[in-house]
């Protein structure tokens, strides 16, 4: 019997994110970083406009809109608009802040660790105990410094329904210690406010 030849998947197919990765971050999960960003700028003597890189965001992302409204210089890109974080070099910046694709989480963290750039990435907190992630974080802790967390005191909904998972920010070289932040509600039911990009596109009335 002849050996069946493996067919290589086209490159573009490999880069497509899982549809479940596309969660639009509500604004109050962005604004809750204010105090931490101020402290970061103080510690690092940033006396100019802060440069924030949002690698998984279009111009209508709440990250991009909020940071621009508050005086930061924002560099953003998204694979759907032709800017591929995994293929392109990281631009010069002070901070990387975004809600990355969960299906490629290890690649995201590995690239940022290698670049040495401080970051705050919003993600399911359970991922820290996935074997491949825990090992990556432990090895980086041995090499440089440990991951810290900014943890909301509520499960946050991204679509108006009760959230099934706990999300928070994985931080590296951004905050000095793990902290909890208070949120006024969990963004579900009568408190639900869709991300700007959803409202603008008409996905949510």
Question: Where are the language model's segments positioned?
Answer:
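Class I S-adenosyl-L-methionine-dependent methyltransferase catalytic core
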Residues: 1-205
């Amino acid at each position: 019997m002849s050996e069946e030849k493996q067919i290589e998947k086209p490159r573009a197919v490999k880069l497509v994110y899982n549809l479940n990765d596309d969660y639009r971050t509500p604004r109050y999960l962005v604004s809750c970083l204010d105090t931490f960003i101020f402290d970061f700028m103080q510690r690092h003597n940033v006396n100019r406009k802060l440069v924030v890189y949002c690698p998984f965001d279009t111009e209508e992302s709440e990250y991009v809109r909020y940071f621009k409204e508050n005086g930061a210089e924002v560099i953003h890109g998204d694979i759907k608009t032709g800017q591929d974080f995994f293929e392109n070099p990281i631009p010069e910046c002070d901070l990387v802040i975004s809600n990355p694709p969960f299906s490629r989480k290890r690649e995201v963290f590995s690239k940022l660790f290698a670049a040495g750039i401080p970051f705050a990435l919003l993600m399911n907190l359970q991922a820290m105990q996935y074997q491949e992630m825990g090992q990556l974080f432990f090895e980086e802790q041995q090499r440089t410094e440990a991951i810290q967390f900014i943890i909301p005191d509520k499960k946050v909904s991204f679509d108006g329904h009760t959230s099934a998972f706990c999300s928070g920010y994985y931080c590296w070289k951004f905050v000095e210690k793990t902290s909890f932040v208070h949120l006024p509600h969990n963004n579900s039911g009568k408190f639900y406010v869709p991300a700007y990009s959803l409202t603008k596109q008409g996905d949510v009335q």
